[in-house]
Swiss-Prot record:
This is Large ribosomal subunit protein eL20. Residues 1-21 are annotated as: Disordered. One of its GO terms (molecular function) is structural constituent of ribosome. SUPFAM superfamilies: RplX-like (SSF160374). GO terms for cellular component: ribonucleoprotein complex; ribosome. It comes from Halomicrobium mukohataei (strain ATCC 700874 / DSM 12286 / JCM 9738 / NCIMB 13541) (Haloarcula mukohataei). The gene is rpl18a. GO terms for biological process: translation. InterPro entries: Ribosomal_eL20, Ribosomal_eL20_dom. Pfam families: Ribosomal_L18A. The keyword Ion transport does not apply.
Length: 57
């Protein structure tokens, strides 16, 4: 499995906050899904509240 860096923004009380998260995944699509899942479990956010701008290996 490869390590991907996912960057973007998410909605918070203070407006949009930038983020950079590193996830292990076999490809970019799975990395994107794991980032969404992490924000959902850690912050209680819906996928529509997270905007991913880049997925890089």
């Amino acid at each position: 499995m490869s390590e991907f860096t996912v960057t973007g923004t998410f909605e918070s009380r203070d407006g949009n906050q930038p983020f950079e998260k590193t996830v292990e995944a076999p490809n970019e699509n799975v990395a994107r899904d794991r980032a969404f899942a992490a924000f959902g479990s850690e912050h209680g956010l819906k996928r529509t509240q997270v905007e991913i701008s880049e997925v890089a290996q």
